[in-house]
Amino acid sequence: MGNEFQHRTVLLDEAVDALVTRPDGVYVDGTFGRGGHSRAVLARLGDAGRLIAFDKDPRAIETAESIEDARFEIVHDSFAAMKGALDARGVGRVSGVLLDLGVSSPQVDDPARGFSFRANGPLDMRMDPTRGESAAEWLARASVQELTEVIRDYGEERFAFQIAKAIVARRAESDRLGPLDSTGELAQIVGHVVKTREKGKDPATRTFQAIRIHVNQELADLQVVLEAALSLLEQGGRLVVISFHSLEDRIVKRFLQAHASAPAVDRRLPIRAADLPRPPLKLLGRMFPNDAEVAANPRARSAVMRIAERVAP
C-alpha cells in the first residue's frame, strides 16, 4: 500500500521503554498493526534477541513480511493463539508481551474495511476479512435481544434496545430495499434513533464499536491473551497493554490487580503473611499520552497504558 492510510503508533517510546529489559530476550508484539512498535523493539534488541508478532489483518501481514530481519517472525493469527503458537515454536518463556488493543488508523480510514461511520463502505468490520462472519451477515440474522445485549454491553449505549428494533425493522424491508450492508445506512439508522448528542462524538460511535467488538470477539480474545501472557512471562518479564476504551481497560485493570494481590485469608487462621504464596505480578503503573502527542494524533486521546512485571516464578 502507499501512504494513503497513515498510522501513528501511540505511546511508542514509552511502550518500548517499559517492555524491553533484556536486549537478548524473546519478545511478543501481539498486535503488529503497521509495525511501529515492532520496529522500535527490534532497534533495541541485540543479535541474540527475538521478536514474534501476531496480527489477524492480511494487510498487516503484508507489511510485516517486508521486514527483512532474522530476529523477527510474523504469525497470521489472533493474539489469542499466542500460547499455542509459541509452544509450536519451542518458546516456553518470554521477556515481554506488548498488546496495543483496538482498531488501527488504516483500518478505520479505509472505507472498504467497513469500520467507519464517516465514509460509506461495505458493512464488514472483520480484522481478517477472509475469516468469520461479517457485520452485515450478523446483522441479517441477530435477534432484537442479541442486538440489544451487544450494543448495550460492548457499546455502553443507553439507546441499545431502540437501535436494535430499528435494525430489525429495516431488515424486514430487505425484499424492497435490499440487504442492510453499508456503513452509511447503518450510521443513518442509528442517527435517527439516538436523539441526544455527545460533544465531539458521532451518535453511531458506540454502536459501531459494539458491533466491531462482537464480530472480532475482541474482549473474549483479550481475556485469553492476558492469561497466556502471564503463563509465558519469565521472572522479570514485562506485560505492557495499551487500551483505547473503558471496556478494554477495565478487563486489563482487573486482571492485573487480581494477579498482583495476595490471596485473601481468614484472619482467624494461624497463617503468617510471609507464608502466603507471592503474587505473580507487580504493578508498575499506568501512563497516558502527553498533550503534544494528543495534539499530533487526536486518536491517542483515550489511550491508557498499563505495565506489570512478573516477580514470582
Swiss-Prot record:
UniProt keyword list: Cytoplasm, Methyltransferase, rRNA processing, S-adenosyl-L-methionine, Transferase
GO molecular function, one term: rRNA (cytosine-N4-)-methyltransferase activity
GO biological process, one term: rRNA base methylation
InterPro entries: RsmH, SAM-dep_MeTrfase_MraW_recog, SAM-dependent_MTases_sf
Disulfide bonds: none
Cellular localization per UniProt: Cytoplasm
EC number in record: 2.1.1.199
Enzyme class, spelled out: transferase
Residues that coordinate or bind S-adenosyl-L-methionine: G35, G36, H37, D55, F79, D100, Q107
One Gene Ontology cellular component annotation held by this UniProt entry: cytoplasm
Alphabetical list of Pfam families matching this protein: Methyltransf_5
Location, primary (coarse class): cytoplasm
Reaction(s) this enzyme catalyzes, per UniProt: cytidine(1402) in 16S rRNA + S-adenosyl-L-methionine = N(4)-methylcytidine(1402) in 16S rRNA + S-adenosyl-L-homocysteine + H(+)
Family the UniProt entry places it in: Belongs to the methyltransferase superfamily. RsmH family.
Cited function: Specifically methylates the N4 position of cytidine in position 1402 (C1402) of 16S rRNA.
Name by which UniProt lists this protein: Ribosomal RNA small subunit methyltransferase H
Taxon lineage: Bacteria, Pseudomonadati, Pseudomonadota, Betaproteobacteria, Burkholderiales
Gene encoding the protein: rsmH
